[in-house]
Regions:
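Glycine-rich phosphate/adenosyl-contacting loop at the front of the ribokinase-like
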Residues: 1-73, 110-116
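Conserved N-terminal subdomain of the carbohydrate kinase-like
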Residues: 48-132
Length: 133
């Protein structure tokens, strides 16, 4: 099946060992986001997946694209521009404390996408399914 996914890649920062965001100095970083996660899962199941998004033309943006390609995604339709990747900070639940997520997405590369920047006819050519959320 040929799938097109459209959405923002996010850079997730999380603490280790059930620490709160305010505790300790170290964080782990991973690329993700709902559409990126769905796209990778679909690719791992053997589908041909085109990932449509926007990334900053920085070392971090290039690292993100490389990781998406390593996971089997076609990144041909990623736009380049904007100042940064949207981020979120994740605090794992512990004991009676619930998980917590803090988003920082304003002025991300994806936030700066505008009509006409994506060649949708080319994106959807031959596609069977479209996923976005």
């Amino acid at each position: 099946m040929k799938v097109v996914t459209f959405g923002e890649v996010l850079l997730r920062f999380s603490k280790r060992d059930d620490y709160r965001l305010t505790q300790g100095a170290q964080m782990e970083a991973h690329f993700g986001g709902s559409e990126a996660n769905a796209a990778v899962s679909l690719a791992m199941l053997g589908n041909e997946v085109r990932y449509v998004s926007c990334l900053p033309e920085t070392a971090m943006g290039k690292a993100c694209e490389q990781r998406l390609r390593e996971m089997g995604l076609n990144t041909r339709f990623i736009n380049w521009g904007g100042p940064r990747i949207g981020t979120y900070f994740f605090e794992q639940a512990a004991s009676l404390r619930p998980s917590r997520v803090v988003y920082d997405r304003k002025d991300s590369a994806f936030y700066n996408l505008h009509p006409g920047m994506i060649p949708w006819r080319d994106v959807f050519r031959g596609a069977d399914v479209f996923h976005c959320s």
